[in-house]
């Protein structure tokens, strides 16, 4: 019988529970240790999941030689130091998205993984969605032809989650780095991961967290308090141009005066188009007639089992049973894109990569 993998979690905030569910679903994995600077939350989570090895310092947890792999689920500014420390301690790492708060940090993380010969996987969880797999099946079978223009949209009307998400020193940015990263990555992944060559972007801080709004925000972080600051953008838009001539148009917001929240990607190709919002629609021509096509089966993203699939893939990679489909190199490219959007927004000029 194979030895059980022992896993540690660094950062036991809201997103960690999705990782934990994935680990608990694997009979050959043991949830071994938790680490968090918030002692109250740490002990609550330890009691909830029956984990007794609890640490407030990552170095103490990572000193446990029996730990094989780690999930890094901290706020964004701690992704790099926690990931690098884990890799240097000889652990495999699954780091939540975004990989870091800058391309430079991300590159250092990648180098640490290579130096220590350990897996570094980035939590681009949308790649594991049922909707992604269906669209990719159509793309791989050339149903859409050459993809040359796409839209990546993630808009919230009133969705500033508070907590560390609005604090730029911890988050690295607002909806672009928190929400936009999901749809940018998913869209680029489906387009075949072309190389970005230039970016033009703009960011706005107009509505903040709507302090006078009497309606409850739609999304609230576990770390939210009445004293939270909001030093990030509330809306971002960008055009990303790639080496094959294709373009992605991006929109992401925490707060925006729109009718309702929007989460969709749109792909336009030479043979057809596709839209996920949330059900898949295909646009093509059949026998010379314009046709809109939907599938009999549900194609909307299902969160049921989404993170479990991501974790299962991570564990398979750790065991040498699979090749990682969400590697650190893709995280570095994403940070290059995000850095360029923020730089373009600051300077008012296109950024050549």
Where are these regions (language model features)?
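Beta-strand-loop-alpha-helix segment that lines the small-molecule cofactor/substrate pocket
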Residues: 64, 69, 75-76, 80-127, ...
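Short, Asp-centered acidic motifs that coordinate Mg2+ and/or phosphate
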Residues: 33, 53, 69, 149
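Contiguous beta-strand/loop segments that form the cofactor/metal-binding neighborhood of enzyme cores
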Residues: 185-281, 309-316, 320-322
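Conserved SAM-binding strand-loop segment of SAM-dependent methyltransferases
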Residues: 51-58
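N-terminal Rossmann-like dinucleotide-binding module
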Residues: 1-49
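C-terminal helix-rich "cap/oligomerization" subdomain common to oxidoreductases
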Residues: 1-4, 9, 29, 69-72, ...
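Hydrophobic residues in well-ordered beta-strands that form the structural core
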Residues: 95, 120-122, 151, 250, ...
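Predominantly a Rossmann-like dinucleotide-binding segment in NAD(P)-dependent oxidoreductases
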Residues: 11, 126-229, 348
């Amino acid at each position: 019988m194979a030895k059980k993998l022992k896993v540690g979690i660094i950062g036991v905030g809201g997103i960690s529970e999705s990782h934990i569910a994935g680990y608990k679903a694997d009979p050959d994995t043991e949830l071994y240790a938790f680490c968090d600077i918030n002692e109250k939350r740490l002990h609550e989570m330890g009691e909830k999941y029956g984990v007794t090895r609890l640490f407030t310092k990552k170095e103490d947890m990572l000193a446990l030689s029996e730990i094989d792999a780690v999930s890094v689920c901290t706020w964004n500014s701690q992704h790099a130091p926690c990931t690098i420390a884990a890799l240097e301690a000889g652990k495999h790492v699954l780091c939540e998205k975004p990989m870091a708060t800058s391309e430079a940090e991300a590159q250092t993380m990648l180098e640490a993984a290579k130096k220590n010969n350990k897996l570094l996987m980035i939590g681009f969880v949308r790649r594991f969605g049922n909707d992604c797999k269906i669209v990719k099946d159509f793309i791989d079978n050339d149903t859409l032809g050459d993809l040359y223009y796409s839209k990546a949209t993630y808009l919230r009307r009133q969705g500033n989650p508070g907590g560390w998400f609005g604090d730029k020193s911890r988050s690295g940015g607002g909806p672009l780095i928190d929400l936009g990263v999901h749809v940018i990555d998913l869209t680029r992944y489906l387009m075949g991961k072309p190389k970005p060559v230039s970016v033009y972007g703009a960011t706005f801080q107009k509505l903040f967290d709507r302090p006078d709004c009497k309606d409850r925000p739609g999304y609230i972080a576990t770390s939210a308090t009445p004293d939270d600051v909001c030093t990030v953008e509330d809306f971002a838009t960008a055009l990303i141009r790639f080496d094959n001539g294709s373009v992605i148009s991006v929109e992401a917001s925490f707060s925006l005066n729109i009718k309702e929240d929007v989460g969709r990607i749109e792909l336009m190709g030479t043979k057809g188009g596709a839209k996920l919002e949330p059900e898949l629609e295909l646009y093509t021509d059949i026998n010379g007639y314009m046709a809109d096509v939907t599938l009999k089966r549900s194609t909307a993203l299902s969160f049921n089992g989404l993170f479990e699939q991501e974790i299962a893939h991570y564990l398979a990679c750790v065991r040498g049973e699979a090749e990682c489909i969400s590697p650190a190199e893709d995280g570095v490219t994403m940070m290059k894109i995000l850095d360029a959007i923020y730089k373009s927004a600051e300077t008012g000029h296109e950024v050549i990569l």
